[in-house]
Amino acid sequence: MLYPSIDNLLEKLDSKYSLVTVSARRAREMKEDSARVPLVEKPKSYKFVGIALEEIVNDQLTKRVPKEEQ
């Protein structure tokens, strides 16, 4: 079984699209800037996307919704 499971991840974010967007953006941050260390102490994954997914399931990474201009 894969960790973290898609069911656990979808409890944290509202859609698969949001999940992919947030995890890809975070993975790119970690890859391009070595100062951005993982928020997870001992990640099970060695790939950036896997680490980002672990951060989401541990509530260390969430999606920000921009405020609409009125």
From Swiss-Prot:
The GO molecular function terms of this record are: DNA binding; DNA-directed RNA polymerase activity
Q: What is its EC number?
A: 2.7.7.6
**InterPro entries tied to this protein:** DNA-dir_RNA_pol_omega, Pol_omega/Rpo6/RPB6, RPB6/omega-like_sf
- Broad class of enzyme this protein falls into: transferase
Task: Report keywords, A-Z.
Answer: DNA-directed RNA polymerase, Nucleotidyltransferase, Transcription, Transferase
SUPFAM superfamilies to which the protein is assigned, alphabetical: RPB6/omega subunit-like
Q: What's one GO BP annotation on this UniProt entry?
A: DNA-templated transcription
A single GO cellular-component term from the record reads: DNA-directed RNA polymerase complex
List the catalysed reactions.
Answer: RNA(n) + a ribonucleoside 5'-triphosphate = RNA(n+1) + diphosphate
- Read off the Pfam families from this record: RNA_pol_Rpb6
Keyword Nucleotidyltransferase listed: yes
Report whether Nucleotidyltransferase shows up as a keyword of the record: yes
Which HAMAP family does the protein's record reference? RNApol_bact_RpoZ
What is the similarity comment for this entry? Belongs to the RNA polymerase subunit omega family.
* Quaternary context: The RNAP catalytic core consists of 2 alpha, 1 beta, 1 beta' and 1 omega subunit. When a sigma factor is associated with the core the holoenzyme is formed, which can initiate transcription.
Q: What does this protein do?
A: Promotes RNA polymerase assembly. Latches the N- and C-terminal regions of the beta' subunit thereby facilitating its interaction with the beta and alpha subunits.
What this protein is called in its record is: DNA-directed RNA polymerase subunit omega
Name of the gene this protein is made from: rpoZ
